[in-house]
Amino acid sequence: MDSKNVELYTPRKCSATNRLITAKDHASVQINIGHVNAEGIYNGEQTIFAFCGFLRNNGQSDAALNRLAQQKGFLKSF
């Protein structure tokens, strides 16, 4: 019988702070943004942002999402 090692938990990192998001961090969120073409049709690609609970508890997740979206080109920077 062939045995495989199956990972049940894959750790994630916060997109803004690079902190490790632990399994017990129930305040963390993951935001998936789908890419669309010129006609507005989803093309199967997505960008993933993960935010840790520490960032959300301090009220900095909105500013972090705006900063990351500007870096990726989703928002204009003025």
From Swiss-Prot:
Database matches in InterPro entries: Ribosomal_eS21 (IPR001931), Ribosomal_eS21_sf (IPR038579)
Keyword entries, A-Z: Ribonucleoprotein, Ribosomal protein
Keyword Ribosomal protein: yes
GO cellular component terms given for this protein: cytosolic small ribosomal subunit
GO BP term, example: endonucleolytic cleavage to generate mature 3'-end of SSU-rRNA from (SSU-rRNA, 5.8S rRNA, LSU-rRNA)
One Pfam match: Ribosomal_S21e
GO MF annotations, alphabetized: structural constituent of ribosome
Similarity comment: family membership: Belongs to the eukaryotic ribosomal protein eS21 family.
Protein name: Small ribosomal subunit protein eS21
Taxonomic lineage of the native organism: Eukaryota, Amoebozoa, Evosea, Eumycetozoa, Dictyostelia
Gene: rps21
